Amino acid sequence: AFLSGGMDSRWIVEILSKFPISIDTINFAPFGTKDQVFGKLASIALSTSHMEYPGENLSFADRLVDSINLFELSKVHHNGISRLRTIWSGDGGSVGVGHVYLTKEILDEARQSGLDCAAKKIVVSQKYHVPMKLVREKYRHIFSAIYKSIHEELNLYASLEPGRACHLFFMMNDQRRHLFSHYENIHKSRIDFFLPFFDSRMVLNILKSPVDGFLYHRFYNEVFNRFAEPIRSVPWQSYPGHIKCPFSYSENLRDQWADGWMDNNARKKEKILLCRQGFVALKKILFRKTIIHKPYLMASLLLSSTNLRSYDYFIETAIKLINIETSDIFFDGSPLT
């Protein structure tokens, strides 16, 4: 099973520990992060055989696959047969049970002003927008469809309690697509997951329950309070704005959100790679009609690559839009003219 410094994988391993079995756990977080340190402390408390991944400067997905490959080598599991490998994973717990992305402000808006106002609040809180300076003026009207499409989907759930309707929006969009990339490449990794938080029975029970008790990981914290010692007192990594972990820990540990998962050197390399990808994307549209405002993108790439300013989000968005354009499919399904 994966065992990180968060709540999702810990809940799974805590339940597995109640059975008369030996448990192997894997943590592929970079050293010096809360994910790595808290995961190790949890493994000690739960008496698992724990492996930490020593590799450096790889992406999240690459570290995941590489850590499992290394684990199998260390356990001498290879018998010459190519096979599908399975591992318990806490994916889906944050949105499904912790209700990440859902806020009291969104709930209040949905209940007091209606789902149309809740859609606007979701767009703002989740930054579901495209920087308008990136888009040529004649195409900017297209992106008003973001709010419209969210509003239309929320209306599909109008028969539900408004707060739960908003949660279902995140379930049907973020949660449903969460593992898309992994399963698109499962033929390469040959790794499958046991996913308790995607179990239809668990999801149904959550959706039938009042939403307020789950907000900001409230239900999660109630569950953790019922754990036996010593695992109950091991710190965990909390989402920004959610109920904080009550246990003290070193302030020098890197936080997944505020500080980033990688260290400074790895982040610098990621930034260089992003700028390179941005220049490659710009080259694709240099001599073709496009929705992208090319001079602004060029200026952003130059400023970012020279570390004068950071336009990472801007460049990431541009790359995604250019990939859509150069696949000859535009937002209404027809080629761009």
Predicted regions and their residues:
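ATP-dependent adenylate-handling active sites, centered on carboxylate activation for C-N bond formation
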Residues: 1-163, 182-231, 245, 249, ...
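Short linear sequence motifs
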Residues: 121, 132, 136, 163, ...
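Core structural elements
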Residues: 167-182
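Prokaryotic Sec-type signal peptides and long signal-anchor helices
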Residues: 173, 283, 291, 318, ...
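PAPS-dependent sulfotransferase catalytic core
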Residues: 229-312
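C-terminal non-catalytic accessory extensions
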Residues: 299-337
